[in-house]
């Protein structure tokens, strides 16, 4: 078996709208193409031995063990690889379940589709599944050592890529509120919301976490001084930078017991508490000094009591946890080392922050703590005896938590909220040492030891004892108060032809409202009036660029076939999804071989329209009109025929539509007709002579109307939008060159040629065409381009693209010429393969009063050649 290609889908896609995270692996079964599993000796038994947990896969039989029944009866290897890839992820606690395997048009080559949690782990699972299945085919088994290595690698990949527990808590709450989110590449930052409504978080820092407050929280001594000046009970202490100052510092705080910690530490690193001797103080100083970036150390009086974390969000105390240091409880049988291992077997414990609790690690701090208690790792404790392994209670070092939110004294609650206001942090963790949180700190000699920016949420969300607190909810309430938006309107546009023009017109209409519009197209990414990135930008990366921009108020996104197949859409839902048409273009590419399959690709845009949005569909195209059956939102139709039956039935049910009637672009709402503008007054329609441009205008006007854009803004938009080289390069750009005219259009498929031909046929003078086609199109498509050219033009110059896309030089041109001659064996044609030469020749040779129509590979090049001739 051989993996030919692997795609990672990250949004709604051809295979599934709901399951956005999919791996699509193109797999050549090679020698196994004609061998079902029941014909491979020992395969079933080997697979069950290696992965007995596959018994949990239902598959098409619909019951436990169903998949293994299929293997025993006989199924092909692509299907088995799919299930193995899923199971490998399941075994590493990545919940997945969706899969599909489909044979392509090439016998023996399959698309194996399966769900993933982490994309790198998903891709690895696909490769490992192929290795595993191949090994069982060849040897009857898969070595246990290799399986264990695969599972270990998968765990590492997931751990390295997954969100931290606090961030995951916030993201989960955002999802519950239908707030979109996306991971940003910068320092584990996450964006919540789109465009102008976005907020950002990094762990539990937010947009509102001011730099001064964060810096102050990191400055332990500065924080203590400010709180002390405000009358807040804080430890008596001082700072030193040199070892020689340690003895006097101990005297200054009143002698032993003391605490020594780094000035700028976190997560409990470098802290030693309950120091009672000079030797301990020396060791603690060295530890703290090494941990401090500035070599500055805090020496404080030690206060007896339990460690508590108070969490304040947006000025309100939302949770309290008592933190218990890492410890073991004796059973009169096991050594301390064995008890640590037993404790670490708790499924809630993981490495670092990847689970509710962290595994306890034995290091010099643990050994020192045991030594201080006269114990060693091989010591056996009495039953019920508790031995603490660390002095600090951080969860990151194996500690646990008990919820105390309902126990805190009102005065302590008030003090915590006051401290948050004094420091100025929106999300703050306050560390308190007190023997009794139910009593005021002053009454029990309790103190606030420090405050923390970016506090962890694990101890509150999943305490070892007590109630779980949804501390993410108040964060979301702060970032997105009730009724405040998190999304910008998204208009997604797809189709075979007309996408870019419709995208630009829709964006132009929205700009009449005064909003900042971001849009993507085959020309580039634009925000407002400005080009941000040049080139073909119709995929999810470019859409993400718009949705990440903090100035964008409306997103208009051209969504082409290629991006949908390669990565899926960049958004989960849209407000308007426009499908203009589906024609025979790009067939044979990406395993899309029929026009019906292409309609399924384009239909993704209609299917992601949310319940209150509109799918704007072409009622004149049966494949597009049929998409209404899959739409979860509302449907609005457009048609060049006011008598279209679909339009009539739809408006009779008070539906919304746009039609071209009596020369007008009109909106129908139920039985009411609202005329936007006469087509002759809409520049892009070439005085009403370009029907396909009228259809594009219908779609754009209807989309804007569905979104509540004022009629006058729509009217002004279509009146001022021109099919010029500046506004819509490569879309019906007509140039007056004095004695003749030139027209540049990026049509590159039969439907596009037909559409331009409808306009060209009305030209009174000579019609000269400079034609070509992409080399990766089917032979029959290139032949059809030639047939259409022969019907439209008096004279034809056949050229080729610079990028031959896998064909030999002259091959694409020969197919077009075959089409020309099959339509008209007396056609006036000439082959000039170089595009620049063909354009120059056409412009030189066209008759006076004639029209040169150029279908270029490079729109920029064609326009540049024309501009050199100084068009009027």
Curated annotation (Swiss-Prot):
Enzyme class: ligase
EC id: 6.3.2.29, 6.3.2.30
InterPro entries (alphabetical): ATP-grasp, CbamoylP_synth_lsu-like_ATP-bd, Cya_phycin_syn, Cyanophycin_syn_N, Mur-like_cat_sf, Mur_ligase_C, Mur_ligase_C_dom_sf, Mur_ligase_cen
Pfam families in the cross-refs: CPSase_L_D2, Cyanophycin_syn, Mur_ligase_C, Mur_ligase_M
PROSITE patterns: ATP_GRASP
Binding residues annotated for ATP, in chain numbering: 495-501
Keyword Nucleotide-binding: yes
Boundaries of every ATP-grasp domain copy: 224-480
Keywords: ATP-binding, Ligase, Nucleotide-binding
An annotated GO BP: biosynthetic process
MF (Gene Ontology): ATP binding; cyanophycin synthetase activity (L-arginine-adding); cyanophycin synthetase activity (L-aspartate-adding); metal ion binding
Reaction equation(s) it catalyzes: [L-4-(L-arginin-2-N-yl)aspartate](n) + L-aspartate + ATP = [L-4-(L-arginin-2-N-yl)aspartate](n)-L-aspartate + ADP + phosphate + H(+); [L-4-(L-arginin-2-N-yl)aspartate](n)-L-aspartate + L-arginine + ATP = [L-4-(L-arginin-2-N-yl)aspartate](n+1) + ADP + phosphate + H(+)
Domain of life: Bacteria
Function field: Catalyzes the ATP-dependent polymerization of arginine and aspartate to multi-L-arginyl-poly-L-aspartic acid (cyanophycin; a water-insoluble reserve polymer).
Family designation: In the C-terminal section; belongs to the MurCDEF family.
Subunit field text: Homodimer.
UniProt protein name: Cyanophycin synthetase
Species the sequence originates in: Crocosphaera subtropica (strain ATCC 51142 / BH68) (Cyanothece sp. (strain ATCC 51142))
